[in-house]
Amino acid sequence: MTKPFSVVLASLLAITSTVSPLASAQQSQPLDRIAAIVDEDVVLQSELDRAVRNVKSQYAGRENQLPPDDVLQRQVLERLVLVKLQVSRADGNGIRVSDEELNRAIASIAQQNGTTVDGLRQKLAADGMGYADFRASVRDEIIVQRLRQSFAQSRISVSEGEVDTALAQQAATGSQYHLAHILIGLPEGANAEQIATGQKKVDGVKALIDKGELDFSAAAVRYSDSPNALEGGDLGWRSLDEIPNAFAQLIRDMQPGQVAGPLRGPSGFQLLKLVEMRDANAGGEKKMVTEYHARHILVRIGDNQTEAQAKAKIDTIRARIVGGADFQATAKESSEDTNSRGQGGDLGWFPADAFGPDFGKQVESLTDGAVSEPFRTQAGWHIVQRVGSRQTDVSAENQRAQVRETIGRRKLEEEYNRYLQELRGEAYVSYRTGDRADDNATAAPAKSPDPAAPSPPPAKPTR
């Protein structure tokens, strides 16, 4: 399912852009300096300061759930480093965002926030952020999204057998689970000392939670190495097919509010919290859609055929059919759609939006047996003949599609997190924040303080 652009961009823009009431509080800034060197790129101190302010603005009224400023700064800086690394890798893979695409994206963001692009610019200026910086943030987010999509297309697959198994599990349990997690990361091929350090740290975090000194979300913000740490480790609602098999059986036996772990996973040690449960089948009902059976003839536009030539050709073809020529025979002879020409242009049964909105509108407007006027799509010039229509229950089909998507999303999350660890491990990263504990650290992500012997937080956080 495609999310609204404002939602898709939210995670990164929360870090890299402002639109924050705190931003305007800093009216004057010292001369900018480098906060981190990331291979051949840099993170500027102004970027880091802006990102930290935005995280704090999201926790307004819940400040006691945030870690100390030095820890928060490290977490945010590490996330900015990962963004830089992904953008660099995307550039190496030829992933680009044109100015036109960027303009459309920003216009969409403005519209979904109830304003115009000019209004958005004014809001950004009032909050202390330059429009050029905002454009760069949006461009980076689109690039990261495309890198992730490219990764999914090349490395993630879901078999029909996996879908069948997941559907059987869903039928057996009928439940969905709202989960949160804390990850104490381990590098790939971790040695015994690194594993022991990770085990000590995760045991310390679990002890803090068990004693009530930190609630789970606050502990996630403070200690988790997961990309969603600053969201309290919230994983949202998951069905069992979205949960790694090693954890699925544990979750079945848990009650809301319980915390399981430490558990060893591919990326390190994890603590898993079951926040709440719900019936996945509640409100289930048939979903009926109109499907159409149609044939079409396509004349393409290209180097060997101009727009005018293609239009003249499709007009001639339609005139022949209206004059009595058989549509299927004419399609076999004249259509330039190689996928359907051999079947006389037959497209089978399909929902109206299957071939794009323009094609769908033409099919919907026809009566059975009628032939459309020539119309243009990105593919070229068409005529279409509607053969029939029917009402179809697509509940089972939709359910399979949803399950396939959730399995793919879970696989992508696991694999992409490992991919990010690889990127980070291969990179030259040097922090220049002025903190001796962090500066000049290279090729290994910054970690939060070891909680094995933690000092108590300033105040007990609330949920």
Curated annotation (Swiss-Prot):
Biased composition (Low complexity): 441-450
Catalytic class of the enzyme: isomerase
Pfam families: Rotamase (PF00639), Rotamase_3 (PF13616), SurA_N (PF09312)
EC number: 5.2.1.8
MF annotations from Gene Ontology: peptide binding; peptidyl-prolyl cis-trans isomerase activity; unfolded protein binding
Keywords of the record: Chaperone, Isomerase, Periplasm, Repeat, Rotamase, Signal
InterPro entries from the UniProt entry: OMP_Chaperone_SurA (IPR050280), PPIase_dom_sf (IPR046357), PPIase_PpiC (IPR000297), PPIase_SurA (IPR023034), SurA_N (IPR015391), Trigger_fact/SurA_dom_sf (IPR027304)
Catalytically driven reaction(s): [protein]-peptidylproline (omega=180) = [protein]-peptidylproline (omega=0)
Annotated compartments: Periplasm
GO terms under cellular component: outer membrane-bounded periplasmic space
Functional description taken from the UniProt entry: Chaperone involved in the correct folding and assembly of outer membrane proteins. Recognizes specific patterns of aromatic residues and the orientation of their side chains, which are found more frequently in integral outer membrane proteins. May act in both early periplasmic and late outer membrane-associated steps of protein maturation.
Record protein name field: Chaperone SurA
